[in-house]
Structure formats: C-alpha cells, structure tokens
C-alpha cells in the first residue's frame, strides 16, 4: 500500500478440507492476506494461485450496506445473488435459496425485519447468509466474531464448524486467542510474515506468541485446551492513571 510493505515471505496452502485461523495483532496484515486469497489485491511480488472456477465466498469485517436503506433482511441477502446485475427480479428458486440459507443460519424468522433492527450477532449471520447464497467452496471471513457476546461467538463457531463438516474450506482472521484460535484445528500466526503454522498445540507457545504479538504471554493447558494469559500483568488500582 503506497509503497509500504505489509507482508513479505508469505507462503502457505489452503486445502479443500481445511479450517484455518489467521492469527495476529491489528496491522499485522491479516486482512491483506485475505484480500490476496480473494484476488482483489495483487501482490507486489510472488504469485497467488487459485484453482480455476473455484467458488469463493467472503465476509468482510465491515460490510458496505446502507443501514438507512429501506430493505429487509430477506431483500439484503437476495441482492447478493449472482444474477442480480443481469436482471432486477428474482426467480422462485432464488427466493427459495434465500429462505433456505436464512433458516440454516437460524434467522429465518427475521426475513421481513428491517436490517437496522438487527442485533450485532444477527447482522453477522445476515452477512454470512449473503456469502453462502453463492454456494462457495471456500469461505473467507475477516474477524467474524468481533463485537459479539460469548454466546453469539459460540453460535458462529458452531455454524462454521457445521459448514466445514459439510465439505467447505474455512479461512478466518482473528486476534482472539482463547475465544477462537485455541478451538481451531489449524492456525497461521502472522505479523507481516508467517511466524508459525500448525495446530494450536504447535503454535500457541510463549515463543511464537511473543513473536506474533510482541508481548510476553504465559500458556496454560486445561482439559486439553491451551489458554493464553498475559505474563505477570500489572495490577490496576482504581483512581490511578494508566
């Protein structure tokens, strides 16, 4: 971007049966990496290879939707259909597909609700529905659980796990180590380059996490799950300045 190097020496594969989390701090290049995979951004050097005719869905962190525009959830999802630019009307099968994907994501009863009436978690599901309507083989998601509560985060993770079980490859970005990363089967730790790659057991180590986030962390294990805490955090006393 404007001659600023965002990523370098990045090399990894996304396989058809993979569920991958790209982990790193803000500004580490996670979104840029997704855009390279999506091929909406060209690398300054190197190659991004994608299988011909591969169907890729994308759920950005911020959707470009006008919340004051008078449309319902059903209409918003319908607008993402492939033929929306070719003809303004939708076929019966396209409408049925929208109903099916809304039902699958647990928001079938919200179809007639105005989009600005949705909660944060409901908005996330609506945008996921827009991506799924095109029946992607690979789904890319940028921080899909940011700004939602714990219950909604778990619901979204279960939805993505179900999609993966059905054969869809999933790639998501996150900086949430305990809430998201530790539950994923495959992680890529990024801080302008790939710092580590493998299972949570492989990469959620003090050394890799310090290289990724620039902070010392302690890694604990509970019931087979790795948990990350700040190493010797400074206690906060009310009334003092941070």
Give, region by region, the residue ranges found by the protein language model.
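Conserved ABC ATPase "signature" region
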Residues: 78, 92-110
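Helix-to-loop junction immediately C-terminal to a conserved catalytic motif
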Residues: 38
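The feature captures the beta-strand-to-loop junction immediately N-terminal to the Walker
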Residues: 23-25
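Conserved ABC ATPase signature
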Residues: 114-118, 122
């Amino acid at each position: 971007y404007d001659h600023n190097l965002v990523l370098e020496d990045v090399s990894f594969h996304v396989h058809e049966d993979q569920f991958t989390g790209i982990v790193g701090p803000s500004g580490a290049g996670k979104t840029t990496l997704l855009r390279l995979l999506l091929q909406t951004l060209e690398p300054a050097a190197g190659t991004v290879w994608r299988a011909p005719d591969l169907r890729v869905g994308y759920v950005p962190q911020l959707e470009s939707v006008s919340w004051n525009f008078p449309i319902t959830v059903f209409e918003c999802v319908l607008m993402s259909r492939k033929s929306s630019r070719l003809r303004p009307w939708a076929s019966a099968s396209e409408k049925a597909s929208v109903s099916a994907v809304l039902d699958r994501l647990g928001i079938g009863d919200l179809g007639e609700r105005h989009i600005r009436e949705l909660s944060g978690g409901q908005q996330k599901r609506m945008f996921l529905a827009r991506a799924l309507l095109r029946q992607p083989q690979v789904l890319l998601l940028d921080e899909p659980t940011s700004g939602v509560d714990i219950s909604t985060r778990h619901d979204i993770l279960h939805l993505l796990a179900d999609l993966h079980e059905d054969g869809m490859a999933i790639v998501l970005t996150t900086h949430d180590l305990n809430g998201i990363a530790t539950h994923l089967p495959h992680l890529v730790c990024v801080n302008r380059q790939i710092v580590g790659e493998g299972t949570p057991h492989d990469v959620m180590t003090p050394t890799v996490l310090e290289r990724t986030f620039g902070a010392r962390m302690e890694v604990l294990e509970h019931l087979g799950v790795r948990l990350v805490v700040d190493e010797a955090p400074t206690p906060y006393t009310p009334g003092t300045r941070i």
